[in-house]
């Protein structure tokens, strides 16, 4: 005998209902089959709402009519498929049931409340009608059907709304029915009968449990749970798209997973199957050829030490603590006896080794009752201050990692908690079962999905993912996108994926939580309708529970730089070539670092100085190793390196500036380069890295241009005026040459001060040969002197700058 149970989604419409029927038929043709059915999807919700609204004397018409319509739709479809289906007879049964429901609703209205026995009678009508429709389907195809009446044949103990089946007595009753071998067996799920013969329920979503009980009573070869997914996954595939299907699980693994929130199987399903070692197979009604997941006692050890990650939401944690608990016998017993007496299920328990406190979780719906019960139980201790006031923390979730292999495996807990820490998720409490089959962490509910994603990434997925949010798509930003596209396959081989989830310019932005299609990103951005808005980005990462978001600023805007502190606080890493943030007032500079440290996220700005050259990282490493910066000089502008190199070759200032502008070495308005302010910012950043606390206004700057030159003029007008300075620079170049020197635009840090100026350097100076757009940075330190640590290379250009940003983005994975 095979038992097949079908859930509501598998019976939701005529097509799915027929598919379920055919699967029962196919099983019956191979060996006798029993079908256990839930109510069609949405029906139980409607029925529950009917009694609730009737008790409040509210209209029930909408729920009543929608429920009937679902049944009518199914039977009409089944009749269309097979005109032998007894449409009129089945419709009459449905109508009769709803007439009875209407009568019960009227009684509820009169009483102003709903008794549990009446509620149970209404709530289970969906299952009863599923059986009526399935019986008609089989009879239309010439089969003889045996209906197992769960009220008469499954003995249960407990309340009207949640009871447990007595398998031994129920087996005797089922055996006494002498079910003929040729009959298709059908039974409504969710229901049983108490010792008085009254209808009772097995708890919401209890049809899985019903099927397991029937399988145990029949001594079935297998209990198949047919649902709308391919089996049991390592976590909810709706939360983590790359969750893995588990081919096998042990009974105990399945019980732990279902207890802590896995939705595929009801927590009590395994209990009746385990004593007889009846396998439980989870299958997909919509994909019956898929192998599914097998749960039994014969699971062999396999590579997966962890089988699943679950989240159980809507919990409250109670902390009972105080000096009166230390060494006092029976305190824990009193706590949990009080909970048991109030009918409150305790889900997780943790106790400090000092015996000073006990913490436990209950469903949040039970929190108020639990608090009242505890305060009553410990009234004397609370009054005498032997106990502190009962603390209740609401809106919590339990994240659990489950697997039989965890007992032998090392480092699972470390990876679990490390993943939560890296996702900036605070842990409220921790518990581990004595079997070492599961580890649980209590976290804020608004972080639960991020916790599942981060934990799954750490335990199951070697692939590291960066979710990139790019602001600024000019030369550098556009080149960065192209590099990301080019490197996709290479990074995939290294198990790294960069998903560009947002692209924004000053006006509009594109968003996609799964990563944008970058093939035609420019055109897509041009046609985007979403205005650029940082608040939308923040809402986006919270809505989609992004685990590793990286905010990349490729603008030079002060306004965007002003967002970094908030971005770090809200959970972004920040990567930027924009120098404005690091050269703002020291208060903001320090705030950025404090926020990065507090949120355990990275603020990376290697390209602030030297574009793709590893300047910042090398300086930080030197200082971390105990070195000290004593003196610095460097050429920090690629455009001015080019310009002064060409002056040396004999070109005039106006000629070389026009050439640099044409080649794109300068800003569209070359005065931005010639003012020296960009070099001043870079020099200030280096000084601050070395621990020198200066403001931008403290940097002494000698610009290339005289003060006031071309003020109020356009860029083109400025270029027309520039020849006025040619003779002066020709003279300065000649004077330097006569002394065996060349002119360079140099930034210096000395004795706690910063200066940017035009300097004549001789052949012995490391900056003498630096030109053609190269940068060179000479660090004289305690360790590096008299010969400095010299970093030299091209420090300008979209490609090298984008490559430096790319490297910083990848460094966030070392988080």
From Swiss-Prot:
Residues 1-249 are annotated as: Aspartokinase. InterPro entries: AceGlu_kinase-like_sf, ACT-like_dom_sf, ACT_Aspartokinase, ACT_dom, AK-HD, Asp/Glu/Uridylate_kinase, Asp/hSer_DH_NAD-bd, Asp_kinase. NADP(+) binds at residues 476, 555, 579, 664, 667, 797. Its cofactor is a metal cation. NADPH binds at residues 476, 555-556, 579, 797. A sodium ion is seen in the structure; a metal ion may subtly affect the relative position of the nucleotide-binding region to influence enzyme activity, and could increase the stability of the enzyme. Residues 250-470 are annotated as: Interface. It comes from the Bacteria. GO terms for biological process: homoserine biosynthetic process; lysine biosynthetic process via diaminopimelate; methionine biosynthetic process; threonine biosynthetic process. Residues 320-392, 401-478 form the ACT domain. L-homoserine binds at residues 667, 678. It catalyses: L-homoserine + NADP(+) = L-aspartate 4-semialdehyde + NADPH + H(+); L-homoserine + NAD(+) = L-aspartate 4-semialdehyde + NADH + H(+); L-aspartate + ATP = 4-phospho-L-aspartate + ADP. Its EC number is 2.7.2.4, 1.1.1.3. Bifunctional aspartate kinase and homoserine dehydrogenase that catalyzes the first and the third steps toward the synthesis of lysine, methionine and threonine from aspartate. Homotetramer. PANTHER family: HOMOSERINE DEHYDROGENASE, PTHR43070. This is Bifunctional aspartokinase/homoserine dehydrogenase. It comes from Haemophilus influenzae (strain ATCC 51907 / DSM 11121 / KW20 / Rd). The lineage of its organism: Bacteria, Pseudomonadati, Pseudomonadota, Gammaproteobacteria, Pasteurellales. The gene is thrA.
């Amino acid at each position: 005998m095979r038992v097949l149970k079908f859930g509501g989604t598998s019976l939701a419409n005529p097509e799915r209902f027929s598919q379920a029927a055919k699967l029962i038929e196919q099983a019956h043709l191979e060996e006798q089959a029993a079908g256990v059915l839930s109510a069609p999807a949405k029906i139980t919700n409607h029925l529950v709402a009917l009694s609730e609204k009737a008790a409040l004397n509210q209209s029930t018409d909408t729920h009543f009519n929608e429920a009937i319509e679902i049944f009518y739709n199914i039977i009409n479809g089944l009749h269309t498929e097979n005109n032998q289906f007894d449409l009129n007879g089945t419709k009459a049964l449905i109508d009769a049931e709803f007439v009875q429901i209407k009568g019960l609703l009227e009684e509820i209205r009169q009483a102003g409340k709903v008794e549990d026995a009446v509620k149970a009678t209404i709530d289970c009508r969906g299952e009863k009608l599923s059986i009526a429709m399935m019986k008609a389907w089989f009879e239309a195809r010439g089969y003889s059907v045996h209906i197992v009446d769960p009220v008469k044949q499954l003995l249960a103990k407990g309340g009207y709304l949640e009871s447990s089946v007595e398998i031994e007595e129920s087996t005797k009753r089922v055996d006494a029915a002498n079910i003929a071998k040729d009959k298709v067996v059908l039974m409504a799920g969710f229901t049983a009968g108490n010792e008085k013969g009254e209808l009772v329920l097995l708890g919401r979503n209890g049809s899985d449990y019903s099927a397991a009980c029937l399988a145990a009573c029949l001594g079935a070869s297998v209990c198949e749970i047919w649902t709308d997914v391919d089996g049991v996954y390592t976590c909810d595939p709706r939360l983590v798209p790359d969750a893995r299907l588990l081919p096998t699980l042990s009974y105990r693994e399945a019980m732990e997973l279902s207890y802590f929130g896995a939705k595929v199987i009801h927590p009590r399903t395994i209990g009746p199957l385990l004593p007889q070692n009846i396998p439980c197979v989870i299958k997909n009604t919509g994909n019956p050829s898929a192998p599914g997941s097998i749960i039994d006692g014969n699971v062999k050890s396999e590579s997966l030490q962890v089988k699943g990650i679950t989240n159980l939401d809507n919990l409250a944690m109670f902390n009972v603590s105080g000096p009166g608990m230390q060494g006092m016998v029976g305190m824990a017993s009193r706590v949990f006896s009080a909970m048991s007496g109030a009918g409150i299920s305790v889900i997780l328990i943790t106790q400090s080794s000092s015996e000073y406190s006990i913490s436990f979780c209950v469903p949040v719906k039970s929190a108020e009752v639990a608090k009242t019960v505890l305060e009553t139980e410990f009234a004397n201790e609370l009054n005498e201050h032997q106990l502190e006031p009962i603390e209740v923390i609401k809106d919590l979730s339990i994240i659990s990692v489950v697997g039989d292999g965890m007992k032998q495996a090392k480092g699972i807990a470390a990876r679990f908690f490390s993943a939560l820490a890296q996702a900036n998720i605070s842990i409220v409490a921790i518990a581990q079962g004595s079997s070492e089959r599961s580890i649980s962490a209590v976290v804020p509910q608004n972080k639960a999905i991020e916790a599942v994603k981060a934990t799954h990434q750490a335990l199951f997925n070697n692939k590291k993912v960066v979710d990139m949010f790019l602001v600024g798509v000019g030369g550098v930003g556009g080149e960065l996108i192209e590099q990301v596209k080019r490197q996709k396959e290479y990074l995939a081989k290294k198990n790294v994926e960069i998903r560009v989830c947002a692209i924004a310019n000053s006006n509009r932005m594109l968003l996609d939580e799964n990563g944008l299609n970058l093939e035609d990103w420019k055109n897509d951005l041009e046609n985007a309708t979403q205005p650029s808005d940082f608040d939308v980005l923040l809402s986006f990462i919270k809505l989609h529970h992004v685990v590793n978001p990286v905010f990349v600023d490729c603008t030079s805007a002060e306004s965007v730089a002003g967002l970094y502190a908030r971005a770090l606080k809200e959970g972004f890493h920040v990567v930027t070539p924009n120098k404005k943030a690091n050269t703002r007032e020291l208060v903001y500079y320090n705030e950025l670092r404090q926020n990065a440290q507090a949120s355990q996220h990275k603020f990376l700005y290697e390209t602030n100085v030297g574009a793709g050259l590893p300047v910042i990282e090398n300086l930080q490493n030197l200082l971390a190793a105990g070195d000290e910066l004593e003196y610095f000089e460097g050429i920090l502008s690629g455009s001015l390196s080019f310009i002064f190199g060409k002056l040396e070759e004999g070109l005039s200032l106006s000629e070389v500036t026009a050439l640099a502008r044409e080649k794109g070495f300068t800003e569209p308005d070359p005065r931005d380069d010639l003012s020296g302010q960009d070099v001043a910012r870079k020099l200030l950043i280096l000084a601050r890295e070395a621990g020198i606390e200066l403001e931008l206004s403290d940097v002494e700057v000698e610009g290339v241009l005289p003060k006031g030159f071309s003020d109020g003029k356009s860029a083109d007008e400025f270029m027309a005026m520039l020849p006025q300075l040619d003779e002066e620079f020709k003279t300065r170049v000649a004077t330097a040459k006569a002394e065996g020197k060349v002119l360079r635009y140099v930034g210096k840090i000395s004795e706690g001060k910063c200066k940017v100026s035009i300097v004549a350097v001789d052949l012995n100076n490391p900056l003498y040969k630096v030109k053609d757009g190269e940068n060179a940075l000479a660090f004289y330190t305690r360790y590096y002197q008299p010969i400095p640590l010299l970093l030299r290379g091209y420090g300008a250009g979209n490609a090298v700058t984008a490559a430096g940003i790319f490297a910083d983005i990848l460094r966030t994975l070392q988080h």
